[in-house]
Each structure stands twice: as structure tokens, then as C-alpha cells.
A protein has these predicted regions:
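N-terminal glycine-rich phosphate-binding loop and ensuing alpha1 helix
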Residues: 1-66, 97
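Active-site metal-binding loops of divalent metal-dependent hydrolases
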Residues: 10, 102, 128-130
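Short acidic/polar active-site loop segments enriched in Thr and Asp
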Residues: 47-48, 121, 149
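Conserved core of the sugar-phosphate nucleotidyltransferase
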Residues: 64, 131-188
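Short mixed-charge
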Residues: 65-93
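A short, glycine-/small-residue-rich helix N-cap motif at loop->alpha-helix starts
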Residues: 101-108
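Active-site nucleotide-sugar/metal-binding loop of Leloir-type enzymes
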Residues: 110-122
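Short beta-strand-to-loop acidic/aromatic patch adjacent to the donor-nucleotide binding site
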Residues: 120-131
Length: 188
């Protein structure tokens, strides 16, 4: 199973971070959101990724081009212009990076990577800026069992503000950022 990850949007709500990098490259715990998403899939044995690059996509390409170097212990001999790798840390991933355009929308990005998934029985398709605790193995099994064209993971959006319950002029309950209005949204 391959995973197609959307990583081309502008990320306007994180403008202080995304003025220099795409939103999937914003770091959590010293690693890009994109890395965390890929680790989640990899934990379920899914290691073949197609990244739909767009806005500042070169930063994603540079990240993966230098990934092995950054994850390994190395010695550089400046005199000989050589490098010796001591401890190698690598992921079992295959990562295909496709420039899908700066202004493409979801369908356009999927269309531009269609040649890379055309021989797949099914594939996973997710956003490059959302983390979850979805059991990927169970999700794929569910999809295969039901034999539909698509399976959508739904979630309740978090509320944006704390909610107060007031009786008379007294606060009787406070709930910090309750789940949204009860409507499910597409979680990827």
C-alpha cells in the first residue's frame, strides 16, 4: 500500500513558520509534522510514500536528500574532501517527491500523482499537516473488507474557545475547548 500525502498548501494560519517552509515541515519535537505522519504509517508496515509538493516544495526535497546524513554519525575529512559514516540510522521508507504546483487543489494534486498509483489496488491519502492516533492497519482492513472506492476517516473538530455554562449570574461549569458543534469533518 502506498501513501499519498498532500504537502503543497500555503499554511496561512501558521504564517510565522510557513513564510520559510511549507506547513508539513513545521517541527514538533524537533521533527517535521511530515516525519511524524510517516512514522505513524511506518509503525503499521506502510513505508511507500508519495509526497505532493507545492509551496516551497524544495525544502521537502532538501530534507529527504539530506535525511541520511542528518540521521547518521559522520566524520568529515576536509583535507581529503571525504566523509566517513559511522552509525547509520535510516528509515525503511521509499519516498517519491512530486511537484504538483503551487496553486493546485486536492483533486489536481491527486491527478498529478496518478501515474505513481495507477497500478495500486488501493492507496492511503492524507493531509500533510494532521496527526492522529488512527490504527492504520485496522483502517486498511476496514477498507478492504467493505470493498468501496474510498474510506474516509472522520473526526470531531476541537472547539476554538473554552465554553462556559452559566445559570443566573454564576458560572456552573467550564469546559476547556470542547469538541465542535457535534458535526464530523473529514480527517484525511
Amino acid at each position: 500500500v502506498k501513501v499519498v500525502i498532500l504537502a503543497g498548501g500555503l499554511g496561512t494560519r501558521l504564517s510565522e513558520e510557513t513564510s520559510v517552509k511549507p506547513k508539513p515541515m513545521v517541527e514538533i519535537g524537533g521533527k517535521p509534522i511530515l516525519w511524524h505522519i510517516m512514522k505513524m504509517y511506518s509503525a503499521h508496515g506502510v513505508n511507500d510514500f508519495i509526497i505532493c509538493c507545492g509551496y516551497k516544495g524544495y525544502t521537502i526535497k532538501e530534507y529527504f536528500a539530506n535525511y541520511f546524513l542528518h540521521q547518521s554519525d559522520v566524520t568529515f575529512c576536509m583535507k581529503k574532501n571525504s566523509m566517513e559514516v559511522h552509525k547509520k540510522r535510516a528509515e525503511p521508507w521509499t519516498v517519491t517527491l512530486i511537484d504538483t504546483g503551487d496553486d493546485s487543489l486536492t483533486g489536481g494534486r491527486l491527478g498529478r500523482v496518478s501515474d505513481y498509483i495507477k497500478n495500486e489496488k488501493s492507496f492511503c491519502f492524507t493531509y500533510g499537516d494532521g496527526l492522529s492516533n488512527v490504527n492504520i492497519t485496522d483502517l486498511i482492513s476496514f477498507h478492504e473488507k467493505h470493498g468501496k472506492d474510498a474510506t474516509v476517516t472522520a473526526t470531531y473538530p476541537p472547539g476554538r474557545f473554552g465554553a462556559l455554562e452559566i445559570k443566573g449570574n454564576q458560572i456552573t461549569q467550564f469546559t476547556e475547548k470542547p469538541k465542535g458543534d457535534g458535526g464530523l469533518i473529514n480527517g484525511g
